[in-house]
Every structure is written in structure tokens, then in C-alpha cells.
């Protein structure tokens, strides 16, 4: 990791495969907290490249706990967070509205890293019990038109970095990654981002979805 950090500090970029390996190593506990915090800090000082984001995303998808809810044809309504405005959780509130209208929603989220109102914070306050049990998720979808996937239960890397992200308290590239790695891989997604330049990265999700449907 030391060599990788030196290269990044010199404004070099990671290749797709290298980025994938780094996320796999984070999940395996091969880096200490300071090294992971340094990696996060790099991407606060420059934009992440599409190749880097793609590699990170591929690693998370490869390590995820897969969930098949395709029979419900659900939509994912999600935001990156990190806009610094300390608003209420808009995407989660939107999920309640859409599910209440009878449309199936599969929400993938986490505790807030830069706020107190992450999706998991909101769901927990409403009495939702986080689970990976597919039967419970299906029953939730059938009864309420919504199923909630707490990200750390479905991906070891996201669990590994959660305390570091919370300690830093600043927006990171994981804000971009979270919405791109819903374990259900829903064909439909409404995605909110923290600033206009981030919109370009949503094309990654759109492209991958189209490729999966071909």
C-alpha cells in the first residue's frame, strides 16, 4: 500500500485492475486505518477517474452477498449524500412515497458518514431490522412494496471502512460507490448526486445496466 500511496501523492492514477485489488485488500483487512484514511484523502484532492471507480465497483460487486428480487422489478432510489447541507434524507423519504403508491422499491444504504441521517439511521428509527434473509426481504416487498438492504451486511469492504469514514466525517469516493453497488442490481434507479460534475459518473451505472440487459 505504501508504494500505491506514493504514486497517488504524485498525482498518478490507478488502473482498473489495481483499483479492484485495493478494495479487495481493504475487505481482507490487509491495510491499517491510517493507510485507508490516506487513500480516501487522495480523492478529496482530485477527482476519481472512471477507470478507478470502475475497478472499485467491480471489487465490491464481486464480494457482495447477491440478492435476487428480480421478480418484483424494483427501482432503487438513492443519493450519494455528502452535499454538506444537513438536509433530511431525501432519497429515503422518496422511497416511502413511491412504495406507498404501490411501486416496488429496493433501497440499499448505510449509516450516515457525513451526517446523522443516513438511510440506515432513518430505517432503524422506524423499527426496521436489518437482515440478509431473502425470505424476510421478499415478505417485506410483498407486504410493503419496499425492502431495505443495510450495506455493511452485504459487502465486507463497506463494513471495514465504515468507522474510518465516520471518524473522518467528510465526503469520500465511497459516497459515489454506494449507489453503484446495490446487491440486487435493479434495472431501474433514481440517483441523486452531491454536485453537478458527479452526474457524469452516473453514466457508469447506466452503461453497466444496459450491458446486463443485452
Language model feature labels by segment:
Residues 136-192:
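Phosphate/diphosphate-binding glycine-rich loops and adjacent basic-rich segments that engage nucleotide
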Residues 112-128:
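Active-site-proximal loop->helix
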Residues 202-209:
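Conserved small/polar residues in nucleotide/adenosyl-binding loops
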Residues 125-140:
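A glycine-rich helix N-cap at a beta->alpha junction
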Residues 74-116, 175-176, 181:
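Glycine/serine-rich anion-binding loops at beta->alpha junctions
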Amino acid at each position: 500500500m505504501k508504494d500505491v500511496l506514493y504514486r497517488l501523492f504524485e498525482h498518478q492514477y490507478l488502473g482498473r485492475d489495481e483499483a479492484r485489488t485495493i478494495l479487495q485488500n481493504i475487505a481482507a483487512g490487509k491495510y491499517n486505518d491510517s493507510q485507508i484514511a490516506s487513500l480516501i484523502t487522495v480523492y478529496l484532492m482530485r477527482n476519481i477517474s472512471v477507470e478507478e471507480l470502475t475497478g472499485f465497483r467491480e471489487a465490491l460487486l464481486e464480494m457482495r452477498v447477491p440478492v435476487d428480487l428480480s421478480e418484483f422489478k424494483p427501482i432503487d432510489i438513492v443519493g450519494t449524500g455528502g452535499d454538506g447541507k444537513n438536509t433530511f434524507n431525501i432519497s429515503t423519504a422518496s422511497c416511502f412515497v413511491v412504495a406507498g403508491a404501490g411501486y416496488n422499491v429496493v433501497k440499499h444504504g448505510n449509516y450516515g458518514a457525513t451526517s446523522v441521517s443516513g438511510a440506515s439511521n432513518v430505517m432503524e428509527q422506524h423499527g426496521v431490522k436489518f437482515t440478509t434473509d431473502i425470505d424476510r426481504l421478499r415478505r417485506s416487498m410483498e407486504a410493503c412494496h419496499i425492502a431495505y438492504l443495510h450495506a455493511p451486511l452485504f459487502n465486507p469492504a463497506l463494513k471495514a471502512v465504515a468507522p474510518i469514514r465516520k471518524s473522518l466525517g467528510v465526503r469520500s469516493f465511497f459516497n459515489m460507490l454506494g449507489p453503484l453497488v446495490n446487491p440486487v442490481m435493479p434495472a431501474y434507479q433514481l440517483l441523486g448526486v452531491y454536485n453537478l460534475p458527479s452526474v457524469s459518473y452516473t453514466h457508469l451505472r447506466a452503461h453497466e445496466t444496459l450491458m446486463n440487459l443485452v
